[in-house]
Every structure is written in C-alpha cells, then in structure tokens.
C-alpha cells in the first residue's frame, strides 16, 4: 500500500471523502451537483472557478469540488488534486465534436501522479438529448477498458431528468468506503 492510499484510508475512517468533479465546459458538472443536492437546476451559469458542496451519503460527509471546465481554467485543475478520494468526469454525450478534446483532458488527468489509483466515475450526461452517444460508445471512444490502475465506471445519465445519477453515486460510494 502506497503513502497516498494510506492517507486516503485515514480520511475514510473519519467518514469524509473529497470528490473532484471535472469535465469540459458545458458538460453539465454544476447541473449534476445541483441535482444531487436537490437544488433548482432551471438556471445554471458557467462556473468561473469552483463550487464546493457538502453532501451526506451513507453516513459519509462528501466534499464535492465542482471545477470550471473552460479551456482557460483547465491548467489550474491540478491545484485541486491533493487528497482526492474519487474523480467524477462529466461528458456531454450529445456533443460528439468535443469528444476527442474530452478524451485528451481525461487522459492527461489520469496520468497525474496525485491522481494515481483514484477511482473514476464517468457520467455520460445529456442522454435525454437527440443524438446523444450511448455510454458504451463513449467508453470505447475514451478507451476506458484500457484503464488498469484504478476502478472505473461509466454511467449514462441526464442531470436535467435526474436519471442515472443515483446509480453512479452508489458505485462511487462503494469505492470511497
């Protein structure tokens, strides 16, 4: 067991987990976070910087960090990697033109030393939109099956309809416990 795993284990005993939510701009990160918090999702504005939410799930206090996905903000993502217990990466399933850009960013993230072994949940968001790619198509495009150094899961969802979020979070909670 490495030092990072040991530190993460200590945090789990305290009943806390730090979750990082990343993805390209307009993927639906903030909408997902608000839906999980049971907040109004009718008016969402692009995140400039970050949002932090505390949620209680299964006796755990989750600190969820939603970081803006604009190209100008992405270089700062690494400032938030310390003590991350799980990564939620959000994909806009209806925006196939930006899938390769999203793949590049995810690949870069997974190569970061501070993210070694951190469980990955990919939310294939916006499944309610016409032309949205299925989760298995996105998994194939992102080459998720080649990931061997961490547990991962892809979950089809629609933040606006609230579908798939519960299932994704249940998987994630099993990983951080």
Swiss-Prot record:
NCBIfam families xrefs: small_GTP
Lineage: Eukaryota, Viridiplantae, Chlorophyta, core chlorophytes, Chlorophyceae
Transport is among the record's keywords: yes
Covalent lipidation (N-myristoyl glycine), chain numbering: 2
Keywords, in A-Z order: Cell cycle, Cell division, Cytoplasm, Cytoskeleton, Golgi apparatus, GTP-binding, Lipoprotein, Membrane, Myristate, Nucleotide-binding, Nucleus, Protein transport, Transport
UniProt-recorded name of the protein: ADP-ribosylation factor-like protein 3
CDD domains: Arl3 (cd04155)
Originating species: Chlamydomonas reinhardtii
Family recorded in the similarity comment: Belongs to the small GTPase superfamily. Arf family.
Protein residues bound to GTP: 23-31, 125-128, 159
